[in-house]
From Swiss-Prot:
Residues spanning the membrane: 1-21
Post-translational modification: Contains two intramolecular disulfide bonds. They are created by the viral disulfide bond formation pathway, a poxvirus-specific pathway that operates on the cytoplasmic side of the MV membranes.
Family in the record: Belongs to the orthopoxvirus OPG155 protein family.
A GO biological-process term: membrane fusion involved in viral entry into host cell
Keywords linked to the UniProt accession: Disulfide bond, Fusion of virus membrane with host membrane, Late protein, Membrane, Phosphoprotein, Signal-anchor, Transmembrane, Transmembrane helix, Viral envelope protein, Viral penetration into host cytoplasm, Virion, Virus entry into host cell
Cysteine disulfide links: none
Function field: Envelope protein required for virus entry into host cell and for cell-cell fusion (syncytium formation).
Membrane topology qualifier: Single-pass type III membrane protein
Intervals, Virion surface compartment: 22-146
Subunit note: Part of a stable entry-fusion complex (EFC) which is at least composed of proteins OPG143, OPG147, OPG155, OPG086, OPG094, OPG107, OPG104, and OPG099. Formation of the viral membrane is necessary for the assembly of the complex. Interacts directly with protein OPG107.
Gene: OPG155
InterPro entries, per database record: Poxvirus_A28
Protein name, as recorded: Envelope protein OPG155
GO cellular component labels: membrane; viral envelope; virion membrane
């Protein structure tokens, strides 16, 4: 064995030892790690002190770049007609003939989630709270879920 191979053996042994030490440290503190994660889970998607939003980068969705809670899209139960996707901007819309817009309704919560948080950018929005219909039932419902 020459000195170069001995050097690489020492470096590899040190690296393996560090991995074992890290693994043992996680094993010893696993209860504390779970407690910390449970305590701070509510802040997972909140805005950080630095001003940049804390994002879940595993899945891209429409709420990733929004830090205001009212602007985030959510699926809510619509009275008597299934589920709708809503935010402060309005509802996800269906565009009908003559460019008329109506609320897009879904039969199940899963259909609403799949449509709202899909990779497709859904830009059709219907806001019932713009003049002259400020006091209609759809606007009151939108305000109640925000």
């Amino acid at each position: 064995m020459n000195s170069l191979s001995i050097f690489f053996i020492v470096v590899a042994t040190a690296a393996v030892c560090l991995l074992f030490i890290q693994g043992y440290s996680i094993y010893e503190n696993y209860g504390n790690i779970k407690e910390f994660n449970a305590t701070h889970a509510a802040f997972e998607y909140s805005k950080s002190i630095g001003g940049t939003p804390a994002l879940d980068r595993r899945v891209q969705d429409v709420n990733d770049t929004i830090s205001d809670v009212k602007q985030k899209w959510r699926c809510v139960t619509y009275p008597g007609n299934g589920f709708v996707s809503a935010s402060v901007f309005g509802f996800q819309a269906e565009v009908g003939p003559n460019n008329t817009r109506s609320i897009r309704k879904f039969n199940t919560m899963q259909q609403c989630i799949d449509f709202t948080f899909s990779d497709v950018i859904n830009i059709d929005i219907y806001n019932p709270c713009v003049a002259p219909n400020i006091n209609n039932a759809e606007c009151q419902f939108l305000k109640s879920v925000l």
